[in-house]
Amino acid sequence: DPDDGTMPPHRRIDVGLDSVKRLQRIGASANLLNLLQKQHPADLAEVFGELSDKDCRGALTLLLDHNSRLAMEALIEYGAEHSAALLADHPADQLAVWLQELPSDDAVALIDELPDDLSAAVLEQMRPQASGDVENLLEYAEETAGRIMNPMVFALSEDLTAGEAIGALQGSREVEMVFYLYVVDERRHLVGVVSLRRLLLVATETPLQRIMTTDLISARVDTDQEEVAQHVASYNLLAIPVVDEENKLAGIITDQSPDAFALT
């Protein structure tokens, strides 16, 4: 309803874009930074795409200097290939600082698009834990599910009750956005899935094994990304678990994963 006081998303972006261009033109960096920091990463990505190369680099550099996390999240939304071209002008040690704050699958998406010598230098400069996580994903062949999965996937033991599962979920730091709750055995084999809604509706003493679905769609780490995208489209999934050759849960691909479902 045009009279309800809200503004359509595309109109908000148009207003933001006009303001960015105006503030850049008059050199009002402080005001420009304030405006950029109020934007959602996806909106910033659209703004980046509408600016000239020079203005885009200027806005990005300003944001990187003051709010690097927001800048990097916007670049992930912007697309790895375009974003890597913007980042390639920065020194490896600085890129390492920015990239190591991202989830490893996001970092891999950007590092994959950097020139080989620069990506190698970046990996050397990253913290051991961060570079190790990234290098583990880089070991998977390009165009495979393993290459784009997020290895930080929350899983529940099949021995839990619904109440215990809810407690585990509340106490986990790995959970960003839960679409499905995957259930594993003591050796981390993927054995089932349960929705959060289902978990909340049953009695707390109900065993997970009684309410989980054992017939679930998954991808192997070596599954081609196009096949993954087709599964997601065919079954209307928000996320898909990734397993290794022993059917152990290795990661997850969501519709938030960079370039994951671009083929759908």
Question: Can you say where each PLM-predicted feature lies in the sequence?
Answer:
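Hydrophobic packing positions in regular secondary-structure scaffolds
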Residues: 1-264
